């Protein structure tokens, strides 16, 4: 991360950056409380016009300069061999909001002479690998996302033909960044919230390494609120913050949402072997 242009506190040696780096090394349940304070500090001290190259945004990471090759191949196959190729290609183009042309070229682009960003290609690949095509998304009226990073996924999904209302549940310090970004992009049907009770039962809930990183009590609140959501796309690591997510999802979550009456599919992600292994879990009617 030493080549990131904008360090929290102005340099790698600043107290803000060191606090963040220490939290990353520890990898315990205090990581997010630390990152909330750092992200809030950066929001008020660093230029929003270049937030995609803040060191804090990269630390999480909300933004990627490189992504696993299988995601790249998934994207390339989709643009060449499916009827939605042009939509997919357009959806991953960097809008140059939150970064400059130089930032894109030096840090964010996936290919030379192309504005496809690595981050957006990875988000699209989650949808592709789990079967969420423009045809499927365009028939939905409400989507909930649990933790949206900087907010790239809703912009991609709208570009794929979704026209409904998109709810994002996230931490306040992350929501303020998403809200700024989505305002600049011109979105008017994205609802940002920090409280579970404001979420509706939806056609789809997306949660990539978010729901399964929540405290168990908060997960229970979420399931009580939107457990009847029709479809789920969850990406998770088996072990995180001392919790066995495989056991939780199998023995608790799937029972709570009455998944026995729905199609449950696990899709291994073998190129992400850390934390006990990584998978997608999809639930459909």
PLM-predicted stretches and their roles:
Residues 150-162:
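Conserved SAM-binding loop of SAM-dependent methyltransferases across substrates and taxa
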Residues 180-199:
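S-adenosyl-L-methionine
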Residues 229-242:
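Conserved beta-strand signature within the Rossmann-like core of class I S-adenosyl-L-methionine
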């Amino acid at each position: 991360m030493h080549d990131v242009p904008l360090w929290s506190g102005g340099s790698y040696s600043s107290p803000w950056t060191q606090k963040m780096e220490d939290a990353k090394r520890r990898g315990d349940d205090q990581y997010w409380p630390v990152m909330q304070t750092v992200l809030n500090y950066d929001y008020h001290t660093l230029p929003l016009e270049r937030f995609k190259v803040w060191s804090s945004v990269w630390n999480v990471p909300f933004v990627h300069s490189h992504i696993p090759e299988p995601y790249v191949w998934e994207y390339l196959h989709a643009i060449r061999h499916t009827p939605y190729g042009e939509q997919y290609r357009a959806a991953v183009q960097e809008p140059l909001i939150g970064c400059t042309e130089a930032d894109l070229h030096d840090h964010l682009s996936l290919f030379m002479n192309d504005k496809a960003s690595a981050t957006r290609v990875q988000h699209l690949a989650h949808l592709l690998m789990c079967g969420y095509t423009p045809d499927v998304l365009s028939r939905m009226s409400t989507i909930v996302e649990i933790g949206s990073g900087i907010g790239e996924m809703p912009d991609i999904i709208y570009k794929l033909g979704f026209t409904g209302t998109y709810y994002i549940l996230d931490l306040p310090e992350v929501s303020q960044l998403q809200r700024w970004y989505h305002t600049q992009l011109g979105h008017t049907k994205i609802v940002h919230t920090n409280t579970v009770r404001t979420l509706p039962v939806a056609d789809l809930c997306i949660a990539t390494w978010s729901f399964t990183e929540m405290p168990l009590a908060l997960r229970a609140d979420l399931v009580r609120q939107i457990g009847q959501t029709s479809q789920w796309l969850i990406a998770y690591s088996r072990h995180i913050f001392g919790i066995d997510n495989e056991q939780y999802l199998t023995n608790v979550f799937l029972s709570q949402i009455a998944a026995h009456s729905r199609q449950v599919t696990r899709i291994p992600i073998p190129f992400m072997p850390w934390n006990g292994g990584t998978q997608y879990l999809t639930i459909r009617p």
